[in-house]
Amino acid sequence: MAVREVYLEAAAVTAAFLADPAVADGWEAPSALARMRIGALASHLANQITQVPPVLDAPIVHERISLTEHYARSTWTDGDLDSEVNTYIRRISADAALSGSRVQAGEAMTAVQHLRRRLPDEPADRMIQLPFGPWALTLDDYLTTRLLELAVHGDDLAASIGVDPPPLPAAGLDRVMSVLCAMAARRHGAATIIRALSRAERSPKTISAL
């Protein structure tokens, strides 16, 4: 299953999840993430869909790099809540949440409908300029990064409202887990990851990729 098809399916499932009444009911409550309310978290999740159409229209002004290099350069992966980038993400997510749950869910669904028409016509070698970070990616690599965000933050939102995470397509979860395993191996070493997944008696306390 091509990454574009997988992303569209995952985005549609996520947009429907954002419309769950439990999300609206808990909008102002604390989320499972430190320093974020449920509304801000939901808005950040919605942004993994709504940011894609404008990204497709943006001019490419920087060099293209690989998906591996993208995550190596990204500063938000260090887990520092007080970092400039993580503080910025929380702020813009809180600002977006002011529009309310109905608007956020509606904008996500509108973006999905737009992308269903547009993505199939994009060239196989299409490149995009990231709205963050001074570099470009292939469209498929960019959509893979959005799949990771949908999976991780979809689970965060589900934990926040006490429900199961949205059922993302298996092909999408396979891609996400492949990326996370590679990131974890760079952080902790390949041997550590192998032990954690195969030898309980030698398993480390954490193999977190993020």
Positions of predicted regions on the chain:
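N-terminal amphipathic, basic helical "cap/leader" segment at the start of enzyme domains
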Residues: 46, 51-56
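Conserved catalytic core of Hanks-type protein kinase domains
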Residues: 17-20, 44
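Structured surface interface patches that mediate subunit assembly and partner/cofactor docking
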Residues: 1-16, 23-34, 54-84, 88-210
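N-terminal interaction modules that seed assembly of large macromolecular complexes
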Residues: 32-45
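DHp/HisKA dimerization-phosphoacceptor four-helix bundle of two-component histidine kinases
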Residues: 43, 47, 145-148
